[in-house]
Amino acid sequence: MVLIRVLANLLILQLSYAQKSSELVVGGRPCNINEHRSLVVLFNSSGFLCGGTLINQDWVVTAAHCDSNNFQMIFGVHSKNVPNEDEQRRVPKEKFFCDSNKNYTQWNKDIMLIRLNSPVNNSTHIAPLSLPSSPPIVGSVCRIMGWGTITFPNETYPDVPHCANINLFNYTVCHGAHAGLPATSRTLCAGVLEGGKDTCKGDSGGPLICNGQFQGIVSWGGHPCAQPREPGVYTKVFDHLDWIQNIIAGNTTATCPL
């Protein structure tokens, strides 16, 4: 069964309402404190919502299905229990979606661009991630990261984000694995065919990093997570690059590719 991967609870907060299933980093290891400087935590009064990616001092990219009322963002987080001295908090000044009605599907337009209320200062634990200069190559080894559950079906949320390497597949692999996917879409297919490594509940909106570039956004996948021959589906950042750059440049009427 294919479900959108919305985030569970990070840090010490816990959601009190039902969420869509999201993906976690199952089968990974604790991230090095210096390798997730662009990783953002989105949360509201009910708890943690999603991950996100800082792309410059004023803008964050995450999944459209992570949108919620009155959410905040924390930058520079590593441990839930031991805050970094350089952690910073911001709120959205503006939110942009591919569709003015916030319409998106499991294979199209699951992306949200957030303008921050004030710039984030780069620091020891905070730095933006480069947007892609070219599309990723099938066969690439890519990095996933997040505070999502590291076990499934019983959920275990770690103190620090977990990271794992997964492989980028031809889209036809996901098309064959997940019922309902169209023959083509503006998404990436990534995982481990033998299973055991995957994003999962709590990781939605976070980055898929290939060769040091921000190539994908955690969107959705199989349920349970990390099953053999069921790679995850990630919004393809490169296909939305013109839209992102136009919005940042001030062209707020820019549209996403069809």
Swiss-Prot record:
Question: Which residues, in ranges, are excised as the propeptide?
Answer: 19-24
Tissues expressed in? Expressed by the venom gland.
EC number(s) reported in the record: 3.4.21.-
Entry-listed glycosylation sites: N44, N103, N121, N122, N154, N170, N251
Q: Enumerate the spans annotated as Peptidase S1 domain.
A: 25-249
* S-S bonds: C31-C163, C50-C66, C98-C256, C142-C210, C174-C189, C200-C225
Matching entries from PROSITE patterns are given as: TRYPSIN_DOM (PS50240), TRYPSIN_HIS (PS00134), TRYPSIN_SER (PS00135)
- Please give the GO cellular component terms listed in this UniProt entry: extracellular region; secretory granule
Q: Which GO terms describe its molecular function?
A: serine-type endopeptidase activity; toxin activity
For the keyword Glycoprotein, the answer is yes
* Quaternary context: Monomer.
The protein's job, in short, is: Snake venom serine protease that may act in the hemostasis system of the prey.
Record protein name field = Snake venom serine protease 5
